[in-house]
Amino acid sequence: MATAYIIGLGRSGIAAARLLKIQGWEVILSDRAHSPNLEITQQELGQEGITVKLADHPSLIDSNLPNLIVVSPGVPWDVNFLQEARDRGIDVIGELELAWRSLQSSPWVGITGTNGKTTTTALVAAIFQASGLNAPSCGNIGYAACELALSQTKTKASSFDWIIAEVSSYQIESSRELAPKIGIWTTFTPDHLSRHKTLDNYYAIKASLLRRCELQIFNGDDPYLHQVGLHQWADAYWTTVKGKEHLLCDAAKGVYLQDNWIVAFGELIAPLNLFKMVGVHNQQNLLMAVGAARLAGIEKGAIAQAIATFKGVPHRLELITNIDGIDFINDSKATNYDAAEVGLVSVNASVILIAGGEAKEGDDRRWIEQIKAKVATVLLIGEAATAFAQRLQQSNYEAYEIVETMDNAVKRGLELAKKQQAKVVLLSPACASFDQYQSFEHRGDHFRQLCQALKE
């Protein structure tokens, strides 16, 4: 029996293990961590015939080499163990690639980019589903991709009409055959450089996915993508919120805003006022989603209906509550400077900003410009608080307080908003969450709980 070794005991890894088990593989699941909860999972999977090794540091032993290694998205692609496995000719792939091998009879929409991926994925899925298509989403929202493959294998169901996949740079690295029918590239700015080393590397990884797609849609309002533009992507479809004259392509291949209408490939689709999400960046996301829908043959009426009923995505400029006329907004997904800058641009009022966490590399200057223009006080939390305070001071901005925790920040945020007549308390951290939380979702959920408790 062929042996598969899966690294990472998260949702993706467990789904991959179950899929391979059903397909007749001997499956070993490995994780570096060890905890009582993981021991429970170990026992449950053991009953399904899946071996789980905890506190495990895998090595390649000649007498017992696996035929396949499946890597979860959080595992660096260039660690020695995986490099050695590839050198020895072992098939090393990511969880998404494993799912693709089972699901490639369905057409995929693959959405990638530094920021905007998740909202665009949610919009595409909402529009496709509103038209009656069986089009589940996978990635950061919806299912793990292997969960979709598993459900189809178990039920022997017919193929999905479409699969809508959010694809990170980590997943592209480990998915050499993944080839969506429609590819969307939302934005491109420096991020994940601790893993990808250089901007050129990061761009090349993203571009490799788009080159395998049959049809490509690009955000023409993104400065970097606009710059590489037509000389690299001559056959692509382009979007812009700035009007037809700003398209990088012929209007017949463009999706754009004109006189507050959404226009796709020269045809009026829907009035923009149907769309309730704030921010120009969300209008950009919408245009890419509409482009994908029209390329998939979806009718205008279904698109308009989905736009009108779309409520947004948790942790992305999510309005939590209003207390005494002050909006509390959760933008926990803003894990870098560019996303946090967009969060501030999207709010048309004086702001109390909660920022900080585990800092990332990047250029913070435009973010700080927005702070100076919009923010009454910055409340700093987490590991980056001291460094952020110094950076703000260097920029001649002194209206900040180091409050350390989210509990302190939410309480203090309400006090200061009342005192300074700010209309919004915004969590938009510009940082990863791992210093204090398991994920940006965990951080955003905690913010939501604290806001709701404050209202009560």
Curated annotation (Swiss-Prot):
The pathway this protein participates in, as annotated, is: Cell wall biogenesis; peptidoglycan biosynthesis
Coiled-coil region: none
Instruction: State the reactions this protein catalyses.
Output: UDP-N-acetyl-alpha-D-muramoyl-L-alanine + D-glutamate + ATP = UDP-N-acetyl-alpha-D-muramoyl-L-alanyl-D-glutamate + ADP + phosphate + H(+)
Give the keywords, sorted: ATP-binding, Cell cycle, Cell division, Cell shape, Cell wall biogenesis/degradation, Cytoplasm, Ligase, Nucleotide-binding, Peptidoglycan synthesis
InterPro entries in UniProt: Mur-like_cat_sf, Mur_ligase_C, Mur_ligase_C_dom_sf, Mur_ligase_cen, MurD
A Gene Ontology cellular-component term: cytoplasm
Question: What name is this protein filed under?
Answer: UDP-N-acetylmuramoylalanine--D-glutamate ligase
Organism (species): Rippkaea orientalis (strain PCC 8801 / RF-1) (Cyanothece sp. (strain PCC 8801))
Q: What is the lineage of its organism?
A: Bacteria, Bacillati, Cyanobacteriota, Cyanophyceae, Oscillatoriophycideae
